[in-house]
A protein has these predicted regions:
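Membrane-embedded alpha-helical bundles of multi-pass transporters/translocases
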Residues: 2-495
Length: 495
């Protein structure tokens, strides 16, 4: 007879809560909202240029300023989050409200007012409204993993599902938009393409919102949001206090914000157009190759989750970051020594090597993402242990504030870089010729910036105290404090 493997609760001596698999999958469908909108908003620079006549430089400034606004609204939402308690719950109300706000703004930005003679003011106002809706949806979703489970083995599993969806959704959207829709609209970014892309995105996001609401329904009740101390109204000083004293959160901000800045610069539509359309010379095939290399790499996330469940979130972030740095450096050398146009030739050795390198790169990046998902939930529990208050929106909002202030420069870096290449009044198109300046700019933005971000990650994580062993102690202390608080509550009731 085989012995039953002991659970994490039995091993650690802590009664962990666990979510059902279908609930985790429904939560992961939040990617249908976030990543489909992410794919669409990545084309905001094209909408601004085509639909509103805004210059490249002005677009970069607008997107940077609105991104900073996005960061400021994140901690402010914590106050709303703290006060929303309806008979329909907290999470579901905020998720649906956020979707409706951003859907109206995106429809106006890409369809309703686009190419109707409107200008900079209209575009900017619509973008601001979008930011408010996006913040409401995204910030609420970020608090859910810590609410669903605190089992150290299951948290990385939740990360696997979210990672898989976060990569699959933009891949599918990219295929639909660039391989199916773009050729039907003449092969260039125009108003017809932007309108159709917006309509598809809003339908996908609506489905995702409903599925997430279904997944969190059993957790969306008042007792879920109770801490280990008497609840007090949230104040702005609480946000400052969290940022000042939550060391794991400080480390996470430094590591993840730098990584995300590089990721967002490289994922801008204009950078992908340069790499796939101008350097490789076949944007449709380039998109297909990206999907081919991405799908198998999702299985790496399962390996990453198992590793993180065994060794902890911090160790997962550090080790997989080192692997990603090596693979990305090899990718740069590969582009330098070959003729990149050969990648665009179906079945060529260059194409096969590119797919394999992309597979390894995407796989290691997925393992980092899985580790990060688990780490953020750990940071929320660390704060509960440290301060006695269960304030997931404050922790995630504080992170998002600093994160978005840093990553707000992604759009201006990308648009500023292509402006240096001569694209001051227009945007790069797949049919443009490749020059040495374009090639090296793409290498720096697509591969160089991520390497710099990972170096910052390794430096930040050296001072992080949140090891696997420490997280077990954190959960034990939380359980003891909650039991003591409950006992004190019953004593007060009897008096």
């Amino acid at each position: 007879m085989f012995k039953k493997k002991p659970t994490a609760s039995e091993v650690d001596g802590v009664q962990y809560r666990r979510a059902k698999t279908w609930q985790i999958i429904c939560y992961a469908c939040n990617a249908l909202v976030g990543m489909s909108v992410y794919s669409l908003i990545g084309m905001a620079s094209y909408s601004a240029s085509i639909g509103y006549g805004i210059t490249t430089a002005a677009v970069g400034i607008i997107l940077t300023c609105t991104r900073i606004l996005d960061g400021i609204t994140d901690p402010l939402l914590a106050f709303v989050y703290d006060r929303v308690n309806t008979k329909f719950g907290k999470l579901r109300v905020l998720l649906i409200a956020g979707y409706l706000i951003e859907a109206l703004a995106l429809y106006g930005m890409f369809t309703g007012f686009s190419s109707k003679g409107m200008g900079l003011v209209t575009f900017t106002l619509l973008y601001v409204v979008y930011v408010i809706g996006y913040t409401t949806t995204n910030m609420t979703a970020q608090t859910i993993p810590a609410i669903m489970t605190n089992d150290p083995r299951q948290r990385p599993t939740l990360g696997v599902w979210t990672t898989a969806f976060n990569y699959l959704v933009p891949m599918v959207m990219s295929m639909v938009l660039n391989v199916v829709l773009l050729p039907k609209c003449g092969g260039t970014y125009n108003q017809a393409f932007l309108t159709s892309a917006c309509n598809i995105t809003l339908i996908v996001a609506a489905i995702g919102t409903l599925l997430v609401c279904l997944g969190v329904s059993s957790y969306d009740k008042p007792e879920t949001f109770v801490g280990t101390k008497k609840a007090e109204p949230l104040k702005m000083a609480d946000i400052v206090e969290v940022l000042k004293h939550n060391k794991p959160l400080q480390c996470y901000i430094a590591s993840n914000a730098s990584d995300k800045l590089a990721q967002q610069v490289g994922s801008q539509a204009i950078i992908n157009t340069i790499l796939g359309g101008i350097i490789i010379g076949n944007i449709a095939l380039g998109t297909i190759l990206t999907v081919i290399s991405m799908v198998p790499s999702i299985f790496f996330a399962a390996f990453g989750a198992k590793y993180v469940g065994k060794h902890g979130s911090k160790k997962g972030i550090v080790n997989f970051t080192c692997i990603s740095m090596v693979i990305t450096a090899v990718m740069v050398v590969f582009f330098i020594v070959i003729d990149p146009k050969q990648i665009g030739v179906m079945g060529s050795p260059a194409m096969i090597i590119y797919v394999l390198l992309s597979l390894l790169q995407n796989g290691s990046n997925m393992c980092i993402t899985t580790s990060n998902t688990s780490y953020m939930a750990d940071a929320i529990d660390f704060e509960l242990d440290r301060s006695g208050r269960y304030i997931p929106a404050v922790v995630s909002g504080t992170y998002s504030l600093v994160d978005k202030l840093i990553t707000s420069f992604a759009a201006v870096i990308a648009t500023g870089a292509v402006a240096l290449l001569g694209y001051t009044a227009t945007m790069p198109q797949p049919t443009d010729p490749c020059t040495p300046a374009i090639f090296w700019m793409a290498m720096v933005l697509k591969f160089g910036l991520p390497i710099i971000g990972w170096i910052i990650t390794l430096i930040a994580m050296r001072s992080c105290p949140l090891s696997k062993e420490e997280m077990v102690n954190v959960q034990k202390r939380i359980a003891e404090k909650k039991a003591a608080a409950q006992s004190e509550f019953f004593k007060e009731q009897l008096q």
